[in-house]
Amino acid sequence: MHNTTKRVTVPALEAMLYETIKVLDHGFIRVIDYMGDDSSIVQAARVSYGKGTKQLNQDKGLINYLLRHYHTTPFEMCDIKFHIKLPIFIARQWIRHRTASVNEYSARYSILGNEFYLPDPANIASQSVVNKQCRAGDSVPKKVSEKVLAILEEDARRCYRHYKELMNADEDGNILDENVSGIARELARINLTLNYYTEWYWKINLHNLLHFLRLRTDPKAQYEIRVYAEKILDIVKAWVPFTYEAFEEYRLQGANISRKGLEVIKRMIKGEKVIHETSGMNKREWEELVKIFR
């Protein structure tokens, strides 16, 4: 059967459909479907039909303008749907981005597989003393990381063993002991550790996806969600290359500067030597401003 379509397609993204992109030790990302491309954004912005007579460089310039000036609705005309397998503790962080449609694997209806995440020793670090929500930059000593991994694996395996015991069923749903009555799956699951994997379908428009990527590809984002975001960023690059370039230029590699920060820069341009004490900024704001220009 010969399939044809009148909708816009992107050859680079078509080649990615249903392909498994590995993430972490057992996770993955798969592109399931998408709608629109760079031309869809331009079309919506111009409120016209078809690609029209505009040159590609004009389309690119318009996309740059739209992103630079924080226009949102043209980017909402593009959608993409992913199938993602990820650790539960990352899923709970991910779902904070509420502007998406999500359908997750049900551990009330089905039995979770015996797959759990263990971090690479290089990514095991102590708590940061500067940022209360993330780890420090340096890895812990080898002896410490080995102990951490042993504890995580031991706890995960023990909890999964008890999970099966509580249900009186194995991973495939087979009864373990005919003389024992197991409890409901919705109750048995509460004993599992957060490093077990879940799966979901996640559909989101391009505007909200770019917001997700801006936050989750940031170096301060947790490593385990950042690696997913980086893979999705590569997908966006293949899907909407003009938008990706504008996003990189104005969001990822650009910087927001406060009113006080601008005043400091103006004073410096005029030749004045400005230090933290004379800047009118608090210590953290000053450090962030200095970091931009390093």
Curated annotation (Swiss-Prot):
In which domain of life is the source organism classified?
Bacteria
Where do the annotations place FAD binding? 73, 96-98, 104, 205-207, 211
Listed GO MF terms: flavin adenine dinucleotide binding; NADPH binding; thymidylate synthase (FAD) activity; thymidylate synthase activity
Q: Which residues form the signal peptide?
A: none
Q: How is the cofactor bound?
A: Binds 4 FAD per tetramer. Each FAD binding site is formed by three monomers.
What the entry lists under SUPFAM superfamilies is as follows: Thymidylate synthase-complementing protein Thy1 (SSF69796)
One GO term of the biological process aspect? methylation
Which residue ranges does the record assign to the ThyX domain? Answer: 27-250
Residues where dUMP binds: 93-96, 104-108, 189, 216
Which residues catalyse the reaction? 216
Give the EC class as a word: transferase
- One Pfam short name: Thy1
Q: What Enzyme Commission number(s) appear in the record?
A: 2.1.1.148
Ordered alphabetically, the record's keywords are: FAD, Flavoprotein, Methyltransferase, NADP, Nucleotide biosynthesis, Transferase
Hey, which pathway is this one from?
Pyrimidine metabolism; dTTP biosynthesis
Task: Show the coiled coil region(s).
Answer: none
The UniProt entry annotates the motif ThyX motif at: 96-106
Extract the InterPro entries matched here.
Thymidylate_synthase_ThyX, Thymidylate_synthase_ThyX_sf
Cofactors needed by this protein, per the record, are: FAD
Q: Which family does it belong to?
A: Belongs to the thymidylate synthase ThyX family.
Subunit text: Homotetramer.
Q: What job does the chain carry out?
A: Catalyzes the reductive methylation of 2'-deoxyuridine-5'-monophosphate (dUMP) to 2'-deoxythymidine-5'-monophosphate (dTMP) while utilizing 5,10-methylenetetrahydrofolate (mTHF) as the methyl donor, and NADPH and FADH(2) as the reductant.
PANTHER family, A to Z: FLAVIN-DEPENDENT THYMIDYLATE SYNTHASE
**What name is this protein filed under?**
Flavin-dependent thymidylate synthase
